[in-house]
Amino acid sequence: MYHGWTDPQVSPMLSVTYYDNVLKAVGKEKAANSIALFMMPGMNHCQGGDGPDTFDKVKVLEQWVEQGKKPAQIIASHMTNGQVDKTRPLCPYPQVAKYKGTGSMNDAANFSCVADAR
């Protein structure tokens, strides 16, 4: 699953609540084999917005289902005028992408997925 944090049409918290309810219903360990949630900072409803909104969804699913490689992160990109101007890791909820403190803030390589400090 993925959902944009700035979705103006469907509250992002609906996806968070659904995901949390699945974990409660079947247990974290069992659910981990079949569900993951990636929240996308700055993405509107399915696409658009200031944040990275583009990644190969089919490839991610194929690697997980067919090869058993559950994504630890997904690299998404943002484009302006047909050019990639930003990449960012999408982290499995509840992790978030944290800037490492050096390098371009528009380069996914300068971020790591960490537990949300809230």
Predicted regions and their residues:
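C-terminal His-loop and adjacent cap/lid subdomain of alpha/beta-hydrolase
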Residues: 1-118
